[in-house]
Amino acid sequence: MTPHINAKKDDIAKVVLMPGDPLRAKWIAEQFMEKPRLVNEVRGMLAFTGQYKGKTITIMGHGMGIPSIGIYSYELMKFYEVNTIIRIGSCGALQGSLNLQDLIIAAKAWSESIYANDMGVEVPADKILMASPQLVELAKKTANQLQLAFHEGLVFCEDAFHQIRKDVLKLAQEKHALAVEMEAHALYANAMLLNKQALTMLTVSDSLVTHAALPAEQRQATFKNMAILSLEMASQLV
């Protein structure tokens, strides 16, 4: 147990799927898993462990932003000995070639955040951290098997949701970042630090280019494909 997770060690599987919203974790568990059990509810950050195609998997929310996912992913990897975390979330498109509902496999994440430095991770000069190559390849293979189109590349991991400095977003576009989100860089930093595996997969919910946005009811339906993709991946990793 930790100050933020009260599950017993054996209650958490070695592969954890992490949406930002704990209610989305609940939805995935109830919709797709057999016999899901609530194993954490500290601070409302729900976690469920259950079976998918006979394999034990945990689904847990991580909250919003680098500090939040930094805490939860670190504690899962460090104290619960989780081997793999796959973040499944939403993002804002930074390139005009991306459409709403597009799937992104975030092979790389760039951020101006100091989180990785504070954790003692050796950050390269370009401030880009990598997802686990094995997970990137597994995501692509599984997406192809499910006939899901996807984009693979760099995402910009932002600290401020209500970003005022437009030059930062312009710089992200110049770096050819596909989209902006708020957690991948910290997740990859923790995986590097603790020698674990991590990947972020995202669905485009908004566009900072066209200013289009998915209504709430469509976001849930679109998220379904990514949830199934992540579960199929997890079942191959356990």
Swiss-Prot record:
Active site: 206 (proton donor)
Binding site for a purine D-ribonucleoside: 4, 181-183, 205-206
Pfam family, one: PNP_UDP_1
Key words, A-Z: Glycosyltransferase, Transferase
InterPro entries: DeoD-type, Nucleoside_phosphorylase_CS, Nucleoside_phosphorylase_d, Nucleoside_phosphorylase_sf
The protein's Enzyme Commission number: 2.4.2.1
Domain of life (superkingdom): Bacteria
Cellular component terms per the entry's GO annotation: cytosol
Functional description taken from the UniProt entry: Catalyzes the reversible phosphorolytic breakdown of the N-glycosidic bond in the beta-(deoxy)ribonucleoside molecules, with the formation of the corresponding free purine bases and pentose-1-phosphate.
Protein name: Purine nucleoside phosphorylase DeoD-type
Organism: Mycoplasma pneumoniae (strain ATCC 29342 / M129 / Subtype 1)
Taxonomic lineage: Bacteria, Bacillati, Mycoplasmatota, Mycoplasmoidales, Mycoplasmoidaceae
